Amino acid sequence: MTQDTIGGADYANRLVALQTARWKRWLGVQVPFRWNLRRLAPGFTLDVGCGIGRNLLHLRGHGVGIDTNGHCVRVARARGLVAFTPEEFAESMYNRPGYFDAILLAHVAEHLAEGDTIGLIRRYSLLVRPQGQLILICPQEAGFASDPSHVEFMDIERLARIASHTGFPPERSFSFPFPRWAGRLFTYNEFVLVGRKPAGSGRQAGQPE
């Protein structure tokens, strides 16, 4: 993944065009995905790689977004959401241990090498309270092939490994909205994995006790 690919105005404009298409509003394309995210009950969420804020809107703004694309951050703010670049977030009131109930990475990990995804989650893992959630959502085969900025295909096994290596042992995983076989044909079929930080966990995964 390069900054030229996802870091500029063109990528932000592409997200706006995709997410605000009139036919998608008419058909209610986001309704099942909104329902799915809400039923996970993430609480106050840190949305890492928030884009223009689709999932923050699904959560009724109950969270904070971070994105490396400043153009996306500006669009999210214009939609009434709280969003920052990583540098801005580091100086914000939200950058505090245990402040969040969950970290969400939705359609982010496939843009990174596995090790980079692990590093990204570790960077923010201390901000999640004990027993808080890590929610990972990634496209299946058809969705992965639909975007040239995708780098690594992330199936449930890889997502489970990422969650385990970042201090959020996997709790459940599933295919959504259709069974696993549909992912080879349906662009919007997703892998969903939920990990949970153990009670009393204070240190960051990978740090010595």
Whereabouts are the PLM-identified features?
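A short glycine-rich, Lys/Arg-flanked "PGG" loop and its adjoining helix->strand segment in the class I
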Residues: 118-130
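Conserved beta-strand signature within the Rossmann-like core of class I S-adenosyl-L-methionine
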Residues: 131-139
